[in-house]
Amino acid sequence: LGCEVHLYEMRPHRSTEAHQTADFAELVCSNSLKSESENTAPWLLKQEMRRAGSFLLRDADSSAVPAGHALAVDRVVFSARVAARIAALAGIGTGPGTITIHREEVLALNENDPNTITILASGPLTSPALAAELERLTGAGHLAFYDSISPIVDASSIDMSKVYFAARYDKGTADYINCPFTKEEYDRFLDALTTAEPVPAKSWEQIPTSPAALSSIHPQDCHPERSTAEAKDLRFDAAPKSSENLPLTTDPSPLHYFEGCLPIEETARRGRDTLRFGPMKPVGLTDPKTGRWPYAVVQLRQENLRADSYNLVGFQNHLKFSAQARVLRLIPGLENAAFLRYGQIHRNTYINAPTLLTETLQLRAHPSILIAGQLSGVEGYTESIASGMLAGRYAAALAHGRQPQPAPRLTANGSLTHYITHAESKRFQPANITFDLLPPLEDDLRKKIRDKKERHRIQCDRALAAWNLWLKSSKESPTVNRPSCDTLVETIP
């Protein structure tokens, strides 16, 4: 986009409670960028990004590992490709089209310099100093909820005689390893899980959370290989309302979790069958040994291109490592599992975007500062990449003296941004991309077309057409009455 970029990264000098490396684009949670099934909302968002030339999505595509209908990446390869791309631009000097890397923590933002456009994309683990600086600028407290990391197991330690490869309902390729449970095995596992010792909450984690942040349910976030429609079949409240499915224990944790990615032990406490109607749902996963669906299933998803490690889908948790080792080895096929990473919880920080941001992701009070990624209130890797892509385009327009044009409401990108900037501020909560965020079809068309898939196809066609026009017109937006900027500063601790 013809800008000189100064990229700030605080690692390795200051790390976070979740990151393990100093690498760019380190994926600390899932390795999935969600569904690639045509005419789904995640697919639409990625299609728009591909048409806009998203480098991060290009690197994700080239780092892909088998994951059925999802785009999952080898996180090490993905990070290395992003780093190589940045290094190539950082090694050609200074001036338009170059990047200068600064390995230092950002402690202050200069909102008064008209010649500097800043993109703040510090993510869910924004450092305390930068969070305090952002609070100084906005005058509003930040919100917080807790995000989770799933365990990873060494593939060579899986007992393949007890598990099987399968895709749900045999759709697509059989990329997932399925660990089947009998009722007795499930009951034993559930009892151990709900009584396992959790990690005590640290003082820095106990930040007041908006009640609204506790009410959103996005099941596909913890089942990213499934479409939004399939994820709705996994609603936790879909379990039978029987006395056997009453909550097992009182929640001992003082933390407030994002409902779309609950720790597995928190889900289990909601009833004995809740896991079987959620992340351990066996429907459509026929066991070749019995010819039937198991009582419950744990799915393992390939973690890297070498296929030497797998993550436990939906098994993010907040248990002590010793407890995890004991409980997870009750999963059939994982009795002798070697865990390369255990599950963890980390705090996720985001701003009250409806109060603070314009539709071009600029702070209302300080328009030379843009907020992108999860800090802006979008939820998920794909949504964060999309948000950063838009912020970069808007910032480049400002730097070249043009008025940035917001992405059209008809598009997935535009609808996601419209949501975070127009939601009810008192009840604002992070959002994944879903068709609920896009404008609905006209009433007469909805009456005429009853099939939901066909409706979604029309929404996707309209979105891509509007996106193509926007890409063309945004290059021709009128100039703004402000000095041209020669520096774009992106701050990513």
Language model regions located:
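C-terminal auxiliary extensions adjacent to catalytic cores
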Residues: 431-475
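Glycine-rich FAD pyrophosphate-binding loop
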Residues: 3-21
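Intrinsic disorder/low-complexity segments
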Residues: 91-98, 111-115, 206-255, 475-493
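N-terminal phosphate/diphosphate-binding loop that engages ATP/GTP or pyrophosphate donors
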Residues: 15-39
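Predominantly flavin-linked oxidoreductase catalytic cores and closely associated redox partners
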Residues: 89-93, 97-219, 251-301, 306, ...
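Internal hydrophobic alpha-helix adjacent to the cofactor/substrate pocket in enzyme cavities
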Residues: 385-405
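A conserved beta-strand/loop capping segment in the N-terminal third of enzymes
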Residues: 19-20, 36-83
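A glycine-rich dinucleotide-binding beta-alpha-beta segment and adjacent secondary-structure elements
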Residues: 312-378, 385-387, 405-423, 428-434, ...
